[in-house]
């Protein structure tokens, strides 16, 4: 009986996890205002405007997307931007793998903006189209290179098990090295935060652009 209960709980947990992944981040209901009206440079406190100007220079969505939410807390936004500057532009991970890690979280969270913004960057950086499309379809990507497979496996084990096995750790360290492995987990966790901020604000791709996850 005890074994049955444990198996039932395990199966239920898996089912609930799959159900949760079926929900996409959704826009406001028709006629409803945005949770966070789009902020402008002029609306920022004077001491936060230099930060806003920096964001506009590097962001594909200007002050939109996660920045529209983050800037409600300017000190946090400043710290987060500095972290993102490292994880986007100065990380030890090759861009192909870094963007792959980001869209894995975009898929798991079904984050419309995260996928919209980073899918083309992943392809541009050399991630095979089939790998990205298989990921979006919800299947283990086929024909991954060894380093891509490690990024996928580490990301998914962390998501599903909240840890990785000793065997995967040793494999990942052998392929990526210690610094890249740490940077991989850091970028993955940071983009969970980004996905949550986007969900909080119900931020969507620019008007007229199709939703990646209908």
Task: Label every PLM stretch briefly.
Residues 9-20:
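Bacterial N-terminal signal peptides
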């Amino acid at each position: 009986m005890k074994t049955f209960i444990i198996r039932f709980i395990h199966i239920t947990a898996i089912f609930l996890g799959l159900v949760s992944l079926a929900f996409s981040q959704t826009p406001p209901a028709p006629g409803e205002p945005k949770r966070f009206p789009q902020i402008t440079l002029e609306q920022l406190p004077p001491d936060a405007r230099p930060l806003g100007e920096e964001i506009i220079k590097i962001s594909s969505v200007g002050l939109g997307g996660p920045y529209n939410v983050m800037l409600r807390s300017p000190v946090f936004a400043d710290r987060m931007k500095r972290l993102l500057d490292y994880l986007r532009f100065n990380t030890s991970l090759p861009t192909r793998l870094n963007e792959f890690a980001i869209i894995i979280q975009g898929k798991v969270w079904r984050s419309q903006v995260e996928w919209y913004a980073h899918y083309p960057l992943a392809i541009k950086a050399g991630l095979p189209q089939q790998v990205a499309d298989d990921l979006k379809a919800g299947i283990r990507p086929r024909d991954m290179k060894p380093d891509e497979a490690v990024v996928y496996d580490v990301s998914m084990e962390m998501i599903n098990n909240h840890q990785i096995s000793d065997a995967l750790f040793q494999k990942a360290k052998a392929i990526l090295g210690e610094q890249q492995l740490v940077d991989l987990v850091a970028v993955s966790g940071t983009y969970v935060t980004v996905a949550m901020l986007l969900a909080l604000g119900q931020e969507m791709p620019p008007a007229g652009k199709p939703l990646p996850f209908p």
